[in-house]
Amino acid sequence: MNANNTLDLTPHFALDGDQPFKDRRAMMPFRGAIPVAKEQLAQTWQEMINQTASPRKRLVYLHIPFCATHCTFCGFYQNRFNEDACAHYTDALIREIEMEADSVLHQSAPIHAVYFGGGTPSALSAHDLARIITTLREKLPLAPDCEITIEGRVLNFDAERIDACLDAGANRFSIGIQSFNSKIRKKMARTSDGPTAIAFMESLVKRDRAAVVCDLLFGLPGQDAQTWGEDLAIARDIGLDGVDLYALNVLSNTPLGKAVENGRTTVPSPAERRDLYLQGCDFMDDAGWRCISNSHWGRTTRERNLYNLLIKQGADCLAFGSGAGGSINGYSWMNERNLQTWHESVAAGKKPLMLIMRNAERNAQWRHTLQSGVETARVPLDELTPHAEKLAPLLAQWHQKGLSRDASTCLRLTNEGRFWASNILQSLNELIQVLNAPAIMREKP
């Protein structure tokens, strides 16, 4: 609020010209949360798992922190793949699950989606993948229609591993292809060439036993509208159930980030990435695929994308594995990232916690409603604040700049607005927090 007790919307206006924002902004995790003291972690965890679940959907996330190679763009690399280390990790991961599976919290509500992330979950052996999936199905209350996603890559994801996942109960595969172009794949340190990646995806689809989805990245070095269009056409023609189109996020600590900083390579500008995204949206629309969220498209009814949708809606998430993060009943936590420390905690029969954060807000659900609304391009602002009309000048300006379909307080994003969704989310998050603050706080000079 300014000195006249009116909301200053101008810092959130879109810029003049072809590009409404300088770059895409990112929302920070644990925003507004209070850390639990280190000496209170164990006690707090016991209190958490002895409480029943809140009336929300529930998810499970498992982190597999091993990769055979370090892709140049990836900021999630933790540990190099080793067969013995993976087998040992599986033993400990199952122990972590079993340690708390019988708790009040874990048994108090059905689980609607399970996600194996990493790292590279498909690097585990067929036997170990089956063991983990079987443990989850036997020990936790998975819903009958629970979505069980295995994230993987082409390298080493052989028929034995795939069939072991399917036989154990996995029903969705998400494969990080990123690009089918052999030259671009080589620059990213992807070991398989384009034809090999295509053949792998085709073989996965032909099994016809699970939803098959692939990730494609836009904004990669050497990528242009032509190569991007070729990737989109291949994804369309393979027979996939769904596809994810993600913008490359250049992280300073990655090999690619360092190469960009040193001038050894270049990546498309924000405006060029925007154009590639719009190209992808138009292509998927012309192909008849339905837009599930800002980055996800489905071709068949098999593809539900439950985990990604529900996590944006504020679903509770149980988390297992080194580096895994979860949230439940107003608390968020992160497991130990250091593999040795994680192993030592599990071996001692302790939850391998690195930190726990407590949400300071009494009612934070509006943030989840906002986030999920932006993610699906429809934000009913009147349901988030009784003062939505105060946002009218901003909504009108965004509409004028092509970010929304109209200027109403039910914000409906265009494809342009979808690309800049993180900026819109950040602005609305800040503004609604001010609008919903007690009047005495809004009136402070």
UniProtKB/Swiss-Prot annotation:
GO terms for cellular component: cytoplasm. Its EC number is 2.1.1.342. S-adenosyl-L-methionine 2 binds at residues 73, 119-120, 178, 190, 215. Inhibited by exposure to molecular oxygen. Binds 1 [4Fe-4S] cluster. The cluster is coordinated with 3 cysteines and an exchangeable S-adenosyl-L-methionine. One of its GO terms (biological process) is porphyrin-containing compound biosynthetic process. Keywords: 4Fe-4S, Iron, Iron-sulfur, Metal-binding, Methyltransferase, S-adenosyl-L-methionine, Transferase. It is an enzyme of class 2 (transferase). The keyword Iron applies. It holds the Pfam family Radical_SAM. [4Fe-4S] cluster binds at residues 67, 71, 74. Gene3D superfamilies: Aldolase class I. This is Anaerobilin synthase.
